[in-house]
Amino acid sequence: MNKIIIFILFLISILQSVRGFTDTDEIVVLYLEAPLFFSKFGTLLANVNAFHSGLGFYSLNSNETYQVDFVAVPGVLESILPNKIENGEIIWNTSGKVQFSDSIDNTGYWSSEKEIMTINNEIFETFLCWAQNYNESLSYYQLFDVLNRNTNELLVKSVVCNDFVWAGFNALYNLGGKYINDSIIASRDIVTLYTRESIEYVQDGSTNIEVISFYEAMLNISIPKNQTINGLIEELDELFKGNFYLYVNGDYYNVTLDSSPFSFAYSESPLPIGERDLSNITLLESCHFQHSSDNDIILNNKNGIGGWIFIIILLSFTTVYLVGGILINKFKNEKSGLDLIPNKDSWSSLGGLISDGFGFIKSKATGSTSGGNGYSSI
């Protein structure tokens, strides 16, 4: 019997080690940056500070860490160029996706980690719900801001990793996040196309002859190995005589480019300050945290997963123990009837332990205990 209790306690200790943040954790929010390396993009991004960014979270009370970022799927280039043109229609294969990982990548991918603010577990859980709503609202990747140089009016807003991060800062601040200090600053990339006119929405753009001709020419452009993004935009501007058709989440816009049509800036960007306003935070009516091994979208109910792992291991152990013990008692010890049950007297007193054990498992699997720390479902 003592061996059974020791084994159960061992399994409980394993279950406790795969937990999430607790209600008492103080959590630090990190601004993560990773350079877009020359080895991948060549000189296309030469002379620019091009970074991928994300948000990291770590507990000051434990070794728990999390990472959330927004990426172009399958890549940034696919958000600019269509997959193909077939039967008189432009076909795209592009989307934007919020990724969640239950650890911060420590392989050296992130070149910079800056502490921004502290939050608690309640804010973290609400943020995860907000992140899913963000991705349902903005499920595409749009590289460019489009700005009217005459009026300084933003005509099209980019939807990139930095936009997600700054929207995340805004959500966390309005939910009650506290800055590490009053002098926190952070910088980001901003890619801008300039026009001096209003942009024109193109009706039925995917089958529009002029739009198709534009993207056929785009697909046929051979980018030299030493081409920079500035040079590429200038080449496109000359090729298309200032008319640029921009694809944005199923829609097309005719953008008449300015004489200096492009800029790539890496500069300080303001963080949210002032009065907090929860009306800025849009959440889904219900949230379910669903972990995916390929980081498919959001979120990980680690307590629930741990609970079911515990159940499976415990039932497997019990089955093997009973079947093995019965076989040994029957064929080696030549017992019969109820005496076949291994440690029969000990098992008869196990009812209370089983009841308590299932109560514990239920609390871990459902997060139903009062004051528990199971994630709200997203």
Swiss-Prot record:
Cellular component terms per the entry's GO annotation: lysosomal membrane
GO biological process: lysosome organization
Top-rank taxon, per record: Eukaryota
Glycan attachment residues as annotated in the record: N63, N93, N135, N181, N220, N226, N254, N280
Keywords, ordered alphabetically: Glycoprotein, Membrane, Signal, Transmembrane, Transmembrane helix
Main location: membrane
GO terms assigned for molecular function: hydrolase activity, acting on glycosyl bonds
Annotated membrane topology: Single-pass membrane protein
Signal peptide limits: 1-20
Subcellular location: Membrane
InterPro entries the record matches: Autophagy-rel_prot_27 (IPR018939), CLN5 (IPR026138)
Residues passing through the membrane, by range: 308-328
Family under the similarity heading: Belongs to the CLN5 family.
Protein's recorded name: Cln5-like protein 1
Organism of provenance: Dictyostelium discoideum
Gene for this chain: cln5la
